[in-house]
């Protein structure tokens, strides 16, 4: 399993709006992507940061999404962002909620 972590800084007072927009407009697009497993959105209670963690069957599926659909989602949320998102990627080592290929879930 593979994950993309997209760290965003919302405009002042817009973190909840950003999270809601991701849920209402981005998640339906994600659900249609090959290999998409789950999306978790975290909203900071102390600052305007929002993290969007998307889980994928494998890196190839996540890369395909990045090439073919990410810009569309970025355009949907752009008006709520203070800065450009920072994207990091990771192999999932352990999960208690997802089956992780090649590793045993805790």
Regions from the PLM with identified roles:
Residues 7-12, 54-57:
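Short beta-strand-to-loop capping motifs
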Residues 9-22:
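Short, surface-exposed ligand-recognition loops at beta-strand->loop->(often short) alpha-helix junctions
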Residues 24-25, 29-37, 55-89:
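An amphipathic, aromatic/His-enriched active-site/gating alpha helix that lines ligand/cofactor pockets
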Residues 23, 70, 102-106:
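Short intrinsically disordered coil segments
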């Amino acid at each position: 399993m593979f994950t993309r972590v997209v760290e965003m800084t919302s405009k002042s007072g817009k973190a909840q709006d950003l999270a809601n927009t991701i849920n209402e407009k981005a998640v339906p697009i994600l659900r249609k992507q090959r290999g998409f497993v789950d999306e978790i959105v975290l909203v900071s209670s102390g600052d305007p940061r929002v993290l969007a963690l998307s889980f994928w069957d494998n890196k190839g599926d996540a890369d395909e999404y990045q090439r073919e659909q990410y810009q569309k989602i970025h355009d949907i949320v752009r008006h709520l962002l203070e800065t450009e998102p920072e994207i990091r990627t990771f192999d999932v080592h352990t999960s208690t909620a997802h089956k992780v290929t090649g590793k045993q879930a805790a």
